Every structure is written in structure tokens, then in C-alpha cells.
Amino acid sequence: MRIFYYLHFLCYVTFILPATCTLVNADRCTKRYGRCKRDCLESEKQIDICSLPRKICCTEKLYEEDDMF
């Protein structure tokens, strides 16, 4: 069973994570008008994962994105 979890983790890190977001440092997040924090507010969206432990890059949502769905 342990090998199954190991393979699942490798698959996630190799295929799924790079397709959804990238690891960025705090300076790159700031250049994209975001901030590295633990949780995004409801008025913000996640754009990347910061290289800092357990932090994500959050930026403000545009009003057009709220009405999209």
C-alpha cells in the first residue's frame, strides 16, 4: 500500500502540479502584483505556489472574472 501512495505522489508532482501552477519566489510573485500568504481571501485568487513553506501567491480578482461563471 505504501508503494501506491509513493507512486500517486510522484504522479501528482510530475504531471498535475506543473500543469496547474509553478513554484515562484517572493520577488516574482510581487512582480505579478501578488503576495505570498498562507490563504487567499475571497476577493483574491491563487496564481502560483511560492517557494516559501506552505505559502501561495495571491492576487486580486478582476471584476470580469467574477461574472464569468
UniProtKB/Swiss-Prot annotation:
Keyword annotations: Antibiotic, Antimicrobial, Defensin, Disulfide bond, Secreted, Signal
Family: Belongs to the beta-defensin family.
Name of this chain's protein: Beta-defensin 114
Range of residues in the leader sequence: 1-26
Gene: DEFB114
GO molecular function: CCR6 chemokine receptor binding; chemoattractant activity; lipopolysaccharide binding
Subcellular location: Secreted
UniProt key word Transcription: no
GO biological process, one term: negative regulation of lipopolysaccharide-mediated signaling pathway
Stretches of the chain forming a coiled coil according to its record: none
Domain of life, source organism: Eukaryota
Database matches in InterPro entries: Beta_defensin_dom
Cystine bridges: 29-57, 36-50, 40-58
UniProt-listed Pfam families: Defensin_beta_2
An annotated GO cellular component: extracellular space
Organism: Homo sapiens (Human)
Taxonomic placement: Eukaryota, Metazoa, Chordata, Craniata, Vertebrata
Keyword Nucleotide-binding: no
Record-linked PANTHER family: BETA-DEFENSIN, BETA-DEFENSIN 114
Tissues showing expression: Expressed in epididymis, predominantly in the caput (at protein level).
Task of the protein: Has a salt-sensitive antimicrobial activity against Gram-negative bacteria, including E.coli, Gram-positive, including S.aureus, and fungi, including C.albicans. Binds to and neutralizes bacterial lipopolysaccharides (LPS), abolishing TNF production by macrophages challenged with LPS. Rescues the LPS-induced reduction of sperm motility in vitro and may protect from LPS-induced lethality.
